[in-house]
Amino acid sequence: MPLLNTITTPYAEAFLQVAESKKEVEKIIAQAKSILQLWDESSELREAMGSPVLEVESKKAALEKIFSGKVTPSFLNFMKLLAERQRIGFLNSVLERLLELYRAQRNIALATVTSATPLNEDQQAALLKNVQSVAGTNNLELNLKVDPDLIGGFVVRVGSKVIDASLSGQVRRMGLELAKVT
């Protein structure tokens, strides 16, 4: 996605610099994660912000109404700037890039854990400890997802490493082995 990075990186870098200058980095990062979740869950928001029919001022007013008091003023201004520059449709990509830059700056590895059922705190703690050894760092961020199609177990992704300890993965591997035999 080099083209997308040429759009998202300058905005993400600039916003990270603003957050650092205002000493709001941790707050901005937490808000970015929340907004990304909202963006993923709300097709109406994505469609409205990405719509070429909706006027820029209407988009800015909608952002103000939705996010005022829920995000820092600098975050709201950032989103309005994206709307003004016809880039609000890329909000998720810009925020993803922001998180990547933040993690890179602080040497934080991202581990995506997909489980068949939600993990309780004890399971998360145990998994975090094991994933830290696989990742080779204690500075780790867990991104938890649930996918009932896994049937049981979990799949962990850290960079290019994948650990598939899911029941569906075991069934798939067993099927491949059986196919080799026949």
UniProtKB/Swiss-Prot annotation:
The record's subcellular locations are: Cellular thylakoid membrane
Top-rank taxon: Bacteria
Per UniProt, the keywords (alphabetical) are: ATP synthesis, CF(1), Hydrogen ion transport, Ion transport, Membrane, Thylakoid, Transport
Kindly list the cysteine pairs connected by disulfide bridges.
none
Spell out where the chain crosses the membrane.
Answer: none
Q: Which residues belong to the signal peptide in this entry?
A: none
Q: What would you give as a GO molecular function for this chain, any one?
A: proton-transporting ATP synthase activity, rotational mechanism
Q: Does the keyword Membrane apply?
A: yes
Question: Which Pfam families does the record match to this protein?
Answer: OSCP
Its GO CC terms are: plasma membrane-derived thylakoid membrane; proton-transporting ATP synthase complex
- Where would one find coiled-coil regions in this protein? none
Q: What is its main location?
A: membrane
HAMAP family according to UniProt: ATP_synth_delta_bact (MF_01416)
What is this protein's function?
Answer: F(1)F(0) ATP synthase produces ATP from ADP in the presence of a proton or sodium gradient. F-type ATPases consist of two structural domains, F(1) containing the extramembraneous catalytic core and F(0) containing the membrane proton channel, linked together by a central stalk and a peripheral stalk. During catalysis, ATP synthesis in the catalytic domain of F(1) is coupled via a rotary mechanism of the central stalk subunits to proton translocation.
User: Could you say which protein family the record assigns here?
Assistant: Belongs to the ATPase delta chain family.
Q: How does it assemble?
A: F-type ATPases have 2 components, F(1) - the catalytic core - and F(0) - the membrane proton channel. F(1) has five subunits: alpha(3), beta(3), gamma(1), delta(1), epsilon(1). CF(0) has four main subunits: a(1), b(1), b'(1) and c(10-14). The alpha and beta chains form an alternating ring which encloses part of the gamma chain. F(1) is attached to F(0) by a central stalk formed by the gamma and epsilon chains, while a peripheral stalk is formed by the delta, b and b' chains.
UniProt protein name: ATP synthase subunit delta
Q: Look up and give the organism this protein is from.
A: Prochlorococcus marinus (strain MIT 9211)
Q: Provide the gene name from the record.
A: atpH
